């Protein structure tokens, strides 16, 4: 690869800014953008280029960093819904250590907008007193009032929602035909990871159609509701299979790197934790996709007159409320 940024989808302005920053980087960067915009991928790509800069074997450092297995790349991520005291302590300890190999250490803090007061305080402390060899890359979906001071210590990098055409183009580079790429991009909720996962799932469009037809499948009887719910929940459960296959491939690739560089268990525990979180998130994403499909069908019904505008509007409000509750 020419550089790690070549794998980033869209975000040309952010990529250009970070690529220019590799030679003489600022002390800390805060990447802010919507969920699905590729925040983690861009942050890891930037870290990979920082660690590969002016090294004798840059491709090895780049490859290790992109696999999130470089000894001088610490990724701080939560295991649960928010950061715990133990994670704040690991950040404190890492903030003052020296690089293992080379003259740069990168600390990547993911989803800083989900940090509690203890973690925010620890982050501020390490940001204000870092050794010159340590660089910070933070990601957030929003800059909350609690993050105002942290944001003031960082160079801001804003990401936009991924354009549908960028998603279509990316899926085509992965070997997906244009018609399927466009159909998947339209139901992926502007999420790169979601689009790639759905593209590998042969039943994805079938699930979308079943959700879209849910309103017409219900005839007012409890039996119809039970049948529809059972079938849709079965499809949601089956949707995890493509993700599990991808996760197996990621573990195999990491093990190959570990064998190549003589590091047993290289980053494996962290990857397994992330995999568990991805599986939990998948169910939420599937239900949100279903709500979107149902909402689109209701909107079409209001437009063509098959659904009363007043009752249809109430249904849409209820769907939006449920979706917002699910996202929390």
Task: Describe each model-derived feature in a short phrase.
Residues 79-86, 112, 156-157:
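Flexible beta-alpha connector loops of hexameric P-loop NTPases
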Residues 112-131, 142:
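Conserved Walker B catalytic segment
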Residues 31, 109-110:
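Hydrophobic residues in beta-strands of the RecA-like P-loop NTPase core, especially within AAA+ ATPase
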Residues 101-106, 131-137:
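Loop/turn-to-beta-strand initiation segments
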Residues 59-84, 146:
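AAA+/P-loop NTPase substrate/partner-engagement loops
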Residues 16-21, 85-106, 114, 121-125:
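Conserved alpha-helical scaffold flanking the Walker A/P-loop in AAA+ ATPase domains
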